[in-house]
């Protein structure tokens, strides 16, 4: 693994595993549609070399209107399934607008899955607005700032979260 810091960007080069490909595939759709997003929580530590498994990848997306959400839904549903909503209408109105996440996995799989959500509060919005750009094996990812990520994981306080913060 090779990590380089450039101003506000970070470049990571490493051998990709199944989880990395999963995240890159999903985030490439968000990038393609210019949807502002940020990866938060456990995958951030995994990206930086923490050796552990993760069942879900948490991602905030900007609060888009239904028209733009439908575009995302159509793109995502080509390669992924939504685990907890049957259609874009239900996902948007019954979940996202009520600040409840929706989950996507590869077709016919459940784990790992993307937990996609709109920001719920000012801290979530700040996280989205102050994300860090990662150039990951020439792909673009956006993660929460490390300055926020570390205290957040310490605040959560589980053994796993404390190890993630290290």
Locations of the language-model features?
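Compositionally biased terminal segments of proteins
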Residues: 1-166
């Amino acid at each position: 693994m090779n990590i380089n810091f450039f101003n506000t960007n970070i470049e990571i080069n490493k051998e990709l595993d199944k989880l990395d490909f999963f995240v890159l595939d999903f985030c490439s759709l968000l990038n393609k549609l210019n949807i502002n997003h940020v990866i938060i929580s456990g995958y951030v530590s995994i990206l930086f070399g923490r050796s552990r498994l993760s069942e879900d990848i948490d991602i905030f997306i900007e609060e888009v209107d239904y028209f733009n959400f439908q575009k995302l839904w159509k793109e995502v549903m080509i390669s992924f399934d939504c685990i907890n909503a049957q259609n874009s209408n239900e996902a948007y109105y019954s979940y996202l607008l009520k600040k409840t996440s929706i989950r996507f996995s590869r077709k016919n799989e459940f784990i790992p899955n993307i937990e996609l959500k709109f920001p719920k509060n000012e801290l979530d919005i700040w996280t989205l607005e102050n994300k860090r750009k990662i150039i990951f094996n020439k792909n673009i990812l956006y993660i929460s700032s490390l300055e926020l990520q570390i205290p957040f994981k310490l605040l959560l306080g589980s053994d796993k979260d404390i190890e993630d913060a290290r």
